[in-house]
């Protein structure tokens, strides 16, 4: 019988629970105050399955060691259980012979993810081999071949880090903006076991970045060399946005198993509502990471120069009702709103990659959209609850925030600013299209207004 890998210990995350912090005094670190004892108990909730003393977040839910081992063994060995009492047995640690079928169902109900067990087993390989076979750590299907670029077969096998050093005058870390090791204050990197959804989004985002490196490559540009960003025109910006539709749609499907189970009409409703918000949120996030002011970074890693909007609209005066200078004057307030209410706020809050992914989850799984089914609403609620649990774990145990709830509230407060910026942008595009102020491709207008398939 194949040996089941043992549970990875979580002592690094829990070490701080047994010591006190220095709050301006020389209190010995070995003393334990009542407040510290309370905080330690609070930060280790009981097992969500059997209510036994918890051992932290495992496979996406708070669980004790026994339930964690039971769930791993059940999934790894593909166990099939049968309940003899109508699948309504009590699951509690004080029951000597607990119904295994109901116990497993309870594990799934509280959010434990079977895929994390399988991927954990796949990752049980010697460290020396990991650098040569990174595909075993991935949890999505391979990136499809994109026919837009003939040379798409030569996709680099290593992760395409987001390197913003070319925007800066001073050297920066070689770490990716999306690498856990690059985040300030991290005591340990998150894992697929402790944060399955957010970590899966990060892994798949890196793969989408590799695909972008191919799709948005300029003629004569080598995909294996570091891209040199440049200011782009309005026409080029619309092309980038149009190409992003299929890439982002694939990323969403790679990240959420629940999405793949929905009917096509529900998938369309969710994605049409999400795409333009995601584009603007991601641009703001990448702009903040670039460290430069007066620009907005696109998915292609090129940028729009706020200080030269006439150059941005230089190709828009053919057969339209305005010159580049007039168009720039008309559109500038919209760009200023993006900078003032969204980019500056994200810079102030210093949003990191996992917080960015959590915002993406909140945006995508919206509630009460026109035509959205009750089933789709319920699926979205469950996914958002899962990511909330993971963010609580991340902020408390990894980033060491004393008040993770306040931090989460600060991050979520970005969403109203994003909504204002998107609505203003949509209004400007609609006005330009109606009055023919500048030439707009029909498919781009439909994308911005969420009317595409």
Curated annotation (Swiss-Prot):
Annotated disulfide bonds: none
Residue segments, region Disordered: 1-37
Residue range(s) of DNA binding per entry: 44-119
A Pfam family it matches: Hormone_recep
GO cellular component terms listed in the entry, alphabetical order: nucleus
Family per record: Belongs to the nuclear hormone receptor family.
Subcellular location: Nucleus
CDD domains cross-referenced by the UniProt entry: NR_DBD_HNF4A (cd06960)
Zinc finger (NR C4-type): 47-67, 83-107
Positions of the NR LBD domain: 178-451
Keywords: DNA-binding, Metal-binding, Nucleus, Receptor, Transcription, Transcription regulation, Zinc, Zinc-finger
UniProt-recorded Gene Ontology molecular function terms: DNA-binding transcription factor activity; RNA polymerase II cis-regulatory region sequence-specific DNA binding; zinc ion binding
Function statement: Orphan nuclear receptor.
InterPro entries: HNF4-like_DBD, NHR-like_dom_sf, Nucl_hrmn_rcpt_lig-bd, Znf_hrmn_rcpt, Znf_NHR/GATA
Top-level taxon: Eukaryota
GO biological-process terms attached to the record: regulation of transcription by RNA polymerase II
Protein name: Nuclear hormone receptor family member nhr-12
Biased composition (Low complexity): 18-36
């Amino acid at each position: 019988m194949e040996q089941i890998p043992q549970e990875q210990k979580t002592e690094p995350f829990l070490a701080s629970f047994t010591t006190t912090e220095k709050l301006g005094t020389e209190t010995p670190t070995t003393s334990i105050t009542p407040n510290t004892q309370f905080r330690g108990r609070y930060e280790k909730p009981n097992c969500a399955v059997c209510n036994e003393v918890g051992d932290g977040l495992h496979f996406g839910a708070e669980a004790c060691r026994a339930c964690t081992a039971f769930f791993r063994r059940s999934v790894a060995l593909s166990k099939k259980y049968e309940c003899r009492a109508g699948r309504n047995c009590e699951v509690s640690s004080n029951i000597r012979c607990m119904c295994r079928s109901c116990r497993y169902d309870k594990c799934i109900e509280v959010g434990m993810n079977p895929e994390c067990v399988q991927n954990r087993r796949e990752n049980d390989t010697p460290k020396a081999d990991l650098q040569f076979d990174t595909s075993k750590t991935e949890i999505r299907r391979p990136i499809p071949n994109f026919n837009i670029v003939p040379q798409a077969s030569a996709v680099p096998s290593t992760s395409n880090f987001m390197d913003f050093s070319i925007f800066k005058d001073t050297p920066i870390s070689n770490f990716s903006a999306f690498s856990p090791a690059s985040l300030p204050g991290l005591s340990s990197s998150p894992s697929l076991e402790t944060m399955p959804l957010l970590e899966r989004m990060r892994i798949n985002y890196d793969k989408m970045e590799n695909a972008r490196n191919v799709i948005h490559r300029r003629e004569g540009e080598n995909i294996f060399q570091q891209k040199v960003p440049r200011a782009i025109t309005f026409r080029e910006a619309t092309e980038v946005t149009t190409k992003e539709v299929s890439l982002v749609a694939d990323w969403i499907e790679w990240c959420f198993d629940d999405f793949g189970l929905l009917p096509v009409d529900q998938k369309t409703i969710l994605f049409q509502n999400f795409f333009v918000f995601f584009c603007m949120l991601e641009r703001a996030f990448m702009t903040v990471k670039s460290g430069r002011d007066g620009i907005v970074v696109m998915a292609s890693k090129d940028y729009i120069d706020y200080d030269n909007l006439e150059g941005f609209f230089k190709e828009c005066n053919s057969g339209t009702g305005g010159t580049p200078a007039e168009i720039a004057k008309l559109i500038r307030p919209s760009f200023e709103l993006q900078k003032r209410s969204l980019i500056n706020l994200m810079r102030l809050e210093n949003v990191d990659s996992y917080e960015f992914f959590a915002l993406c989850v909140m945006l995508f799984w919206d509630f009460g959209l026109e035509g959205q089914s009750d089933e789709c609403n319920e699926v979205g609620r469950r996914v958002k609850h899962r990511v909330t649990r993971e963010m609580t774990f991340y902020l408390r145990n990894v980033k060491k925030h004393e008040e993770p709830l306040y931090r989460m509230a600060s991050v979520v407060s970005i969403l109203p600013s994003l909504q204002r910026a998107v609505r203003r942008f949509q209004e400007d595009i609609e006005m330009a299209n109606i009055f023919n102020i500048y030439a707009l491709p029909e498919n781009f207008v439909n994308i911005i207004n969420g009317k595409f398939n």
